[in-house]
């Protein structure tokens, strides 16, 4: 049979009901929430949909629904049933007596509920529906008579509405969240726009209807309001029309949200990436900088440390048991270490401890006046830029920290200690940042961001050929850290300024009251005139300013981080210029003052020079540490102390050697040999001396060693008498190198170099040891005279060249005197060379057997 044949149309409602009956034969739970189908008798029951029974916001996001549902939905189902009955009835038009809710099916995602009413026998379904709808509208009118409810409903109408369920409700809890757009799927013949409008308009304003087309078998209904689409979907879905030839299935069309911000970021990266980086940097500054500043202030003042409040009676309850426990553990560890050392080595403690504080004070009594001078300079508060100089091992750090600052209750409260040596020895940029942050108290610090920014910068440079500017150099990061530390120092310095201001105002008010009572007195000055400025306050209260102690400050170092010296010099100079803190530099490198001079060119630095301990103090210190005639004869102590001088490091090394079982002769001899080996390996080695980093002359070093082996010091002018030191640049370079490595030290008068002495007393004995060694003496003394011969030969060559030039002239009678002068110079230089050669021959005849004494030059 040919011709058009209508497709088979199944009845949606009957099919679903049959499927449910077939599937639920053995099930006990046949509720609508489980099966998704709401059964009802159309003759005796009606199903209505009430919207806004639940708050609508819970259906927006799953997280919001999960966390807010327990708070917003604390009402029970019985409460909601009663609420629906109250909304469906009025005093003027109550519901029939036998009307009751037989089933209440919540639909929380859509903020509504399906309510099944049993229709009383004396009432029809239509009458009951009309009565409920009219009562609901009347209740809404009464609700809006309240001005607040009326204004609220203008912006967001949350009063429930009621609609009859025309189709077969599908109660599902899928993640299909409500939207104003509905997709209409037709099972059978589709409906026209007019038919769709007629069917859906009752639920709210419709923005547009997109009917079925050849390319799209579904229709789209776009409502103006979300609640209209929700009501239409729950009431119309499953409806059968045209004599069950057409069935409608409705679904929400997800809202396609356009993120304009993300689109702008993706499409305009050249603008957005720098803007995002700037925003993140700003947020980081606003969030982390106050935290870092607080940690810096805590690091300097120890405001929140138990040690600060140890005298408080409440803190004592916790502090003293804690300190006792820590001391007990430390003493236990020391006891175990000492016993293990005695068992394995058979000897006692080899380390010099501080058990006898009087032994240490012997050395510091000589520096008492300098300690007083340092404190006086701090309290004078006049450009407090102090430099404490001294050789290594002279106790500069203890002098400043332990004996000057920590002995003063006011000064020790605000001390920031910076060790340049730890900063310079950092192996990487991140290590330098971490070490600096640790010493400043700068926390938190994120060094991993440097690696990420450098990686991104490298990638951008590879793609575009230009750097992105995201990464910062270590100098910039250090400057930022010092800048934040400056703010913290200012807050610390002015921490008591507000109290001073309030006290001044109170005193002024008291005087004002007295003046008002006594009319004869003249009015005093105003409060604002009496309160001094912050700068003047800091000038009058030097104890309020924090103290910056910079240790191991040098001119340069061998590492890649020597720029830290210049940065610290510039930073501390700005602190002194702004009168914000006292600055104390501790250095053994005289050349380091150049950085300070560059930072403060017009500033005269206050300098304290620390020398070694006196012979008497050194002798008493060593004997008090040994205090055992079996280890050393006290009568021969002077013999061994004299080569060591008063250098604390050498004295302690000598004591350790004796306590370890060496004799005094062996201990001193070994120390001198080590110093001699250090000198020959580093300074008298021609290979090392010719390197680019070594700017000294070996022959000059040998000549200076000979001077100092015979004398404690000598005049600087003595060097100018030797032709080897005629070149001032080379001479100054050699002297600077020797001073840096502590072989020599300078004495200046009015800033002018006057005398040269041995830097480390042990080196004087080493000089004598080397010169007393015939083999070493022959080697370097020969080299010394060869250098002198080279200088004289160069001089002769220049003079001969001058004679050759004069001889080429046509008339030389006017230059006769000049020729005679040059000739005499050549003869003198030649005679000098002959003398030097004779010296070399005499040196070559010396026996290479060494003398037994290093305390003098004795050749047999």
From Swiss-Prot:
CDD domains found in the cross-reference section: RRM_Yme2p_like
Principal subcellular localisation of the protein: mitochondrion
GO biological process: mitochondrial genome maintenance; mRNA processing
Bilayer-spanning residue ranges: 271-291
Subcellular location: Mitochondrion inner membrane
Residues in RRM domain copies: 180-255
GO CC annotation, single: mitochondrial inner membrane
Keyword Metal-binding: no
Protein family (similarity comment): Belongs to the YME2 family.
Protein function: Plays a role in maintaining the mitochondrial genome and in controlling the mtDNA escape. Involved in the regulation of mtDNA nucleotide structure and number. May have a dispensable role in early maturation of pre-rRNA.
The protein's name in its UniProt record: Mitochondrial escape protein 2
Organism: Debaryomyces hansenii (strain ATCC 36239 / CBS 767 / BCRC 21394 / JCM 1990 / NBRC 0083 / IGC 2968) (Yeast)
């Amino acid at each position: 049979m040919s011709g058009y044949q209508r497709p088979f149309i199944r009845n949606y409602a009957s099919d679903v009901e049959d499927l449910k009956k077939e599937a639920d034969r053995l099930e006990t739970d046949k509720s609508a929430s489980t099966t998704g189908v709401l059964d009802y008798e159309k003759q005796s029951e009606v199903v209505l949909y009430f919207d806004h029974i639940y708050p609508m916001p819970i259906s927006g996001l799953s997280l919001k629904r999960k966390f807010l549902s327990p708070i917003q939905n604390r009402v029970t189902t019985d409460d909601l049933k009663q609420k629906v009955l109250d909304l469906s009835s009025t005093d003027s038009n109550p519901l029939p007596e036998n009307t009751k809710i037989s089933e209440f099916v919540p639909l929380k995602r859509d903020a509504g509920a399906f309510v099944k009413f049993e229709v009383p026998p004396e009432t029809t379904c239509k009458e009951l529906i009309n009565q409920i709808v009219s009562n609901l509208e009347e209740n809404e009118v009464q609700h809006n008579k309240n001005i607040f409810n009326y204004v609220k409903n203008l912006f967001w109408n949350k009063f429930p509405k009621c609609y009859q369920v025309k189709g077969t409700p599908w109660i599902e809890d899928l993640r299909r969240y409500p939207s104003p757009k509905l997709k209409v799927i037709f099972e059978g013949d589709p409906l026209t726009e007019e038919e769709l409008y007629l069917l859906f308009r009752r639920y709210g304003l419709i923005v547009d209807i997109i009917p079925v087309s050849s390319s799209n078998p579904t229709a789209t209904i776009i409502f103006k309001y979300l609640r209209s689409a929700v009501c239409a979907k729950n009431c119309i879905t499953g409806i059968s029309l045209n004599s069950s030839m057409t069935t409608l299935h409705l679904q929400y069309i997800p809202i396609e949200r356009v993120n304009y911000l993300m689109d702008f970021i993706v499409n305009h990266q050249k603008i957005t990436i720098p803007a995002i980086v700037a925003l993140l940097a700003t947020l980081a500054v606003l969030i982390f900088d106050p935290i870092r500043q607080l940690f810096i202030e805590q690091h300097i003042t120890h405001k929140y440390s138990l040690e600060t409040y140890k005298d408080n009676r409440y803190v004592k309850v916790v502090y003293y048991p804690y300190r006792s426990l820590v001391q007990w553990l430390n003493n236990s560890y020391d006891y175990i270490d000492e016993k293990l050392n005695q068992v394995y080595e058979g000897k006692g403690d080899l380390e010099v401890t501080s058990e006898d504080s009087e032994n240490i004070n012997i050395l510091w009594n000589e520096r008492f006046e300098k300690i007083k001078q340092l404190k006086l300079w701090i309290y004078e508060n006049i450009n407090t830029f102090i430099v404490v100089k001294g050789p290594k091992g002279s106790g500069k750090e203890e002098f400043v920290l332990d004996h000057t600052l920590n002995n003063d209750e006011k000064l020790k409260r605000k001390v920031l200690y910076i060790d340049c040596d730890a900063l310079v020895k950092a192996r990487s940029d991140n290590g330098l940042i971490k070490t600096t942050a640790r010493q400043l108290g700068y926390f938190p610090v994120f060094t991993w961001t440097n690696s990420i920014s450098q990686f991104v910068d490298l990638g951008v440079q590879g793609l575009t050929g230009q750097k992105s500017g995201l990464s910062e150099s270590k100098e910039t990061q250090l400057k930022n850290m010092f800048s934040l530390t400056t703010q913290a120092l200012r807050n610390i310095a002015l921490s008591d300024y507000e109290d001073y201001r309030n006290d001044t105002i109170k005193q002024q008010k008291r005087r004002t009251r007295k003046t008002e009572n006594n009319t004869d007195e003249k009015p005093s000055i105003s409060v604002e005139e009496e309160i001094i400025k912050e700068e003047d306050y800091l000038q009058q209260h030097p104890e309020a300013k924090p103290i910056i102690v910079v240790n191991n400050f040098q001119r340069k170092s061998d590492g890649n981080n020597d720029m830290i010296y210049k940065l610290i010099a510039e930073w501390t100079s700005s602190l002194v210029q702004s009168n914000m803190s006292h600055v104390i530099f501790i250095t053994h490198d005289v050349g380091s003052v150049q950085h300070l001079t560059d930072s403060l060119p017009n500033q005269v630095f206050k300098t304290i020079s620390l020398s070694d301990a006196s012979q008497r103090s050194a002798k008493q210190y060593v004997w008090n540490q040994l205090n055992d005639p079996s280890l050393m004869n006290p009568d021969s102590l002077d013999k061994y102390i004299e080569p060591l001088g008063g250098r604390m490091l050498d004295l302690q090394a000598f004591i350790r050697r004796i306590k370890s079982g060496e004799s005094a002769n062996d201990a001193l001899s070994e120390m001198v040999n080590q110093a001699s080996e250090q000198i020959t390996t580093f300074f008298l080695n021609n290979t090392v001396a010719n390197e680019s980093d070594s700017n000294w002359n070996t022959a000059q070093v040998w000549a200076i060693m000979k001077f100092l082996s015979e004398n404690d010091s000598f005049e600087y002018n003595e060097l100018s008498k030797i032709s080897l030191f005629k070149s001032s640049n080379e001479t100054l370079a050699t002297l600077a190198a020797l001073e840096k490595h502590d072989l020599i030290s300078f004495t200046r008068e009015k800033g002018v170099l006057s005398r040269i002495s041995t830097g480390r007393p042990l080196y004087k004995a080493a000089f004598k040891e080397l010169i007393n060694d015939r083999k070493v003496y022959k080697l370097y003394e020969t080299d010394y005279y060869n250098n002198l011969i080279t200088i004289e030969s160069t001089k002769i060559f220049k003079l001969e060249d001058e004679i050759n030039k004069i001889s080429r002239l046509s008339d030389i009678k006017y230059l006769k005197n000049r020729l005679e002068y040059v000739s005499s110079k050549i003869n003198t230089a030649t005679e000098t060379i002959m003398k030097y050669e004779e010296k070399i021959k005499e040196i070559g005849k010396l026996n290479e057997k060494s003398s037994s004494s290093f305390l003098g030059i004795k050749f047999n």
